[in-house]
Amino acid sequence: MVAVHTDVVGSLLRPSELLAARGRLESGEISEAEFKPIEDAAVDAAVALQQDAGIEVVTDGEMRRLSFQSGLPDAVDGFGEVPIEAYLWGEWHGEGAVGDQATDRPPRLGVHETLHRRRHIAAEEFTYLRARATAIPKVTLTSPSLYANLWSPDVSRDAYP
């Protein structure tokens, strides 16, 4: 057998239980306190999947994020709506066969105001992952170039000329 080095870049498919719970959270059917154990269980399953496969560096599967792009805008003030079709092409609507749900692209990816950190970008994700993983923990962060590409003269110039 040939040994091949692998790393998980970031996102794994979110389990249907997590998707359903996130929908109930957004609609107000459950509280954040009721949602958290479901989210934690999804992270635990993602870590176990990677470790059972022998992957040496593991992520939380980005179970706590709407998308790989949402970590920074969730932690930093100053982002707002911007048309992103020119930069993020393709459909975000998965096939029912893989349990995916239709979803809109993440909001608030464009810079509207000077950026100010509200909380650490990935401290919660990393702290939880490090406590659960026996493998090397890793949290994926979005490249700054994504947000540079989403600079818009219409909405960003006042903050960053």
Briefly describe each language-model feature range.
Residues 1-161:
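Domain-level signal for soluble alpha/beta catalytic cores
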